[in-house]
């Protein structure tokens, strides 16, 4: 029990590393919380005009999700705890991104971190979700719409592959939270005022 709690806590701390802010500071860019959507995520960093910073943010936010799950799985095999703790570690990393302890619990929407978690939990399903996101994003140029469609699809695919595994429950919770974090985007999509990929930043 003690080690299970430690693994989940470590995953949360990893998730709390807000790379949108960290990368922007390192590259001497404006804080992503001060322009565009105000969201500390790769899509908003892209609005700064610095594609390298956006790509680094995207990759690092995804990697922390992957690392959290892989560490949990590595320890699970040696300490004898089950898939439930691995699933909780993935969820904890996602929650860390949404509510980071290092950044006053003001985090991003979790798309890249969720993608990393999904890939680590099941790479085939993770790739399918990434493909769905990419397809919608390319066709519509709405990152938020792509995230919402993928959030609806992910629990279905994981249920098909894993049945009643705790992994499915963790993915369902992540999807619900991701949709909730995009509630303002949903309103903008319905009103036709949502920003498209590649749009220039405005002060938040």
Feature names for model-found ranges:
Residues 1-7, 67-88, 119-125, 159-170:
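Helix-coil boundary and interhelical linker segments in multi-pass alpha-helical membrane proteins
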Residues 2-28:
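N-terminal signal-anchor transmembrane alpha helix
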Residues 5-10, 54-55, 86-91, 115, ...:
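Hydrophobic alpha-helical transmembrane segments
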Residues 20-23, 43, 94-106, 133-140, ...:
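C-terminal ends of transmembrane helices
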Residues 21-53, 185-204:
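Cytosolic, membrane-interface loops and tails of multi-pass inner-membrane proteins
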Residues 30-42, 102-115, 142-150:
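Short, non-helical or kinked segments that cap or interrupt transmembrane helices
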Residues 46-50, 72-76, 92, 96, ...:
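Interfacial segments of multi-pass membrane proteins
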Residues 47-73, 89:
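Multi-pass membrane catalytic core of lipid/isoprenoid biosynthesis enzymes
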